[in-house]
Amino acid sequence: MKLQDTTLLRQQAYIDGRWCDADSGQTLAVNDPASGELLGHVPLMGSAEAVRAIEAAEAALADWRGRTAKERASILRRWFELLLEHEQDLARLMTREQGKPLHEALGEIRYAASFVEWFAEEGKRVYGDVIPSPANDKRLLVIKQGIGVCTAITPWNFPAAMITRKVAPALAAGCTIVVKPANETPFSALALVELAERAGIPAGVFSVVTGDAPAIGAQFTGHPSVRKLSFTGSTPVGRLLMGQCAETIKKVSLELGGNAPFIVFDDADIEAAVEGALIAKYRNAGQTCVCVNRFYVHDSVYERFAQRFVERVRALAVGPGDTEGTQIGPLISDKAVAKVRSLIDDATDKGASVLLGGKAHALGGQFFEPTVLTDIAPGMELLQEEIFGPVAALVRFTTDEQVIELANATQYGLAAYFYSRDLARVFRVAERLEYGMVGINTGLISNEVAPFGGVKQSGLGREGSKYGIEDYLEIKYLCLAV
């Protein structure tokens, strides 16, 4: 792997300001999903190492929360600058371990850095309240304080941004945090904490442990010193973690599964809708929680949309992420390929037609053809399962009422998208869609200033925006006799 700064490729975990191996000496292999090439190893840590990281976070808490918001912001600002200074190396590292095209990886690094910059400033704006007292001899105040020791479990699909979106608000609020990155993509996390150390974040304030997810997760959810857990991943795992946190009444933030609908109304700009559909479906090979699962297209424009959409999808270039011109990289694992294949087989067995793709790519390995299916009917698994692959399912509809009902017919409620030029319809539909985020005439909705999160079984809490820091704060009421 060609990096300008080779020290960014760390093959040890980071606990209490020290780079360390697992107590057992065991390691996990990290492979390039595009080629299968071995990239390196990281420690296979477990319960004992997780406890040490949590204890270090507890020991570092008093000093870190005792610093002014401005002091913490200065360090976070330096971390932000270092992320941008090393963006090319960080992007190359991400592409090799995660598989996404290099231009997408670079975009993610900049996106990740934006959360650090944003929350460095938001930490200075954690305002309290003065409450008009019902008694002349009392003064009533509200202050906000960091919740304490936090833990975070992050996914492989956005291995940098999902870390900074959790770590930056925690540190800005005066909390300390321990992160467990996905075993598929630990090198991005370790590079981030390397730069955080260079920025001056003190020992114990931000640690990264790699290895046995159940063993580490059990300490993250069960250790009495941990006051908050943040998790991005599947709904079943989120449900499990939430249950484990209940024993010690921890605060939880959960960004879980999605089943995003994309609605094209009869008055939509079809070219714009196709462009938005490509972004919302095929970014990261369809492996994002806000990727579209279900395309609902009005009957009057269905053929026109489908034809143009297939033309554009056919032109997408599939290949290794570090190959120039690549638009779709590999899926993360053989298991992911098998899941996509299974969903397509289920749909075609039940009457769906393949307009494009539908099988493993000629490149072999974990590459899969960009796929478009039509004749989708109720009962097909891909209408209810999160696909997490480059498969688009097209469904006809005729009325607004019908499509709103179809769009909401899921346990999930993360993101939804629709295209319409009727302003009254825009407000009417947006308000009735049961989702935490709605993209209107756009397929790209996420940024650092907007609240990211879902409803129903897509999670709890919001990340990013002015609301993102609130999940790391406790409200304290002060009553002063005068």
Where are the regions that the model predicts?
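Hydrophobic face of amphipathic alpha-helices that form TPR/SEL1-like repeat modules
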Residues: 1-34
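Rossmann-like NAD(P) dinucleotide-binding subdomain of oxidoreductase/dehydrogenase enzymes
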Residues: 128-272, 397
